[in-house]
Amino acid sequence: MTTEQTISANVQFFTISDDEAGQRLDNFLLAKLKGVPKSLIYRIVRKGEVRVNKGRVKPDYKLQHNDIVRIPLVRVTPKNEAPISTKLNKVAELEQHILYEDDVMLVLNKPSGIGVHGGSGLSFGVIEALRALRPQARFLELVHRIDRDTSGILLVAKKRSALRALHEQLREKVVQKDYLALVRGQWQAHINVIKAPLLKNELQSGERIVKVSEQGKPSETRFSIEERYPNATLIKASPITGRTHQIRVHTQYAGHPIACDDRYGDQAFDAKLKQAGLNRLFLHAHSIRFEHPKTAEQMFITAPLDHHLKTILAKLRAEK
C-alpha cells in the first residue's frame, strides 16, 4: 500500500500506510520532499510546521499505521537544487552498475569515490542520485552503508517491507558479506579471525578515526588468503559485526594495512602501488548472501572488480 495524499491550500496531508509504518519522520520527509535541503526539513519540524495527528513531534518520531502527517508545501529555489542536478551526468551511469533488480529491491555495484548518501561535505550520494534518476519511484532507501572509497555491493530497498525484512536479517547476522582487499606484506595464514573491540573518535578537524580499544564495541572479522604477490596479499575479509571502518582497522591492527588507505595505511607501501597506477582504496564488497525479503529465496550475488583494480592485480602477478 502507498501513502494517501490530500492537498489543502498550502498544506499536504499524508496518511501513513502499513508498508511505511516504523520509519522515522525525518526519513519520511526526506523521501517526500525530494531536493529539499536536510537543514530546511529539520527547521520546519522544529518550528512545528510539520505535525503528526495535529501534534508537534521530533524528527526521530517513529511513524505508525494511519498516522496523518501534515507537511507544508516547500518551495526550493533552483540554487538549492543545483548540487544534485549538476552531478547527474556523473551519476547517470549508476544505472549501468545495477547487478539485480525486482519490484522490492535492487543491488548496486557502487563505484569507488561516490558516497552512499549526501553529507560530510558531499552534496549528493548514491541514494540521492537514484532518487533523482528515478523520480517516479515511491520509495528508495539504503539497506546498509559502505565507505565512499570502498566499491562493490550495496543493497537498496524499493519497499518499506523489504527494508524492514533486510534490517532484521542484518540484526540477526544471517547476511554474509565478503570483501576483497589488497594488503601490505605476506598475510599470515594462521590469522583467520580478528576479534578486537573498536572505538570511534572524532579529531578536532572533525575527521572520524577508529582505533582498537578495550573501551570499544565488540568487533569480529574473518579472513582468508586469495592470492599472494611479492610484497602484498589479496585477502577475503568477512565482517561478522558491522562497525565503522572495521576491515580497514582490523587489517591495520594485524600489521597489514590496506593499499591506498589514506587514514590507516602505510605511505611507503602506497607509494609503490601508486607508481603501478593504483589511485584508490583497494577494498571491494565482492559478494553477499541473504534471504530475499519477499520470496524467501536464498540470494547470492557477486560484484566483479572494476577494470582498474584488475589491472593492478595483473601487474602484481607479472612481478612473481
From Swiss-Prot:
GO biological process, one term: enzyme-directed rRNA pseudouridine synthesis
S4 RNA-binding domain location: 23-95
InterPro entries linked to this entry: PsdUridine_synth_cat_dom_sf (IPR020103), PsdUridine_synth_RluA-like_CS (IPR006224), PsdUridine_synth_RluC/D (IPR006225), PsdUridine_synth_RsuA/RluA (IPR006145), RluA_PseudoU_synthase (IPR050188), S4_RNA-bd (IPR002942), S4_RNA-bd_sf (IPR036986)
Active site: D147
Keywords associated with the record: Isomerase, RNA-binding, rRNA processing
Any single Pfam family the record assigns to this protein: PseudoU_synth_2
Catalytic activity, reaction form: uridine(955/2504/2580) in 23S rRNA = pseudouridine(955/2504/2580) in 23S rRNA
EC number: 5.4.99.24
Single GO term (MF): 23S rRNA pseudouridine(955/2504/2580) synthase activity
Protein family (similarity comment): Belongs to the pseudouridine synthase RluA family.
Descriptive protein name: Ribosomal large subunit pseudouridine synthase C
Record organism: Haemophilus ducreyi (strain 35000HP / ATCC 700724)
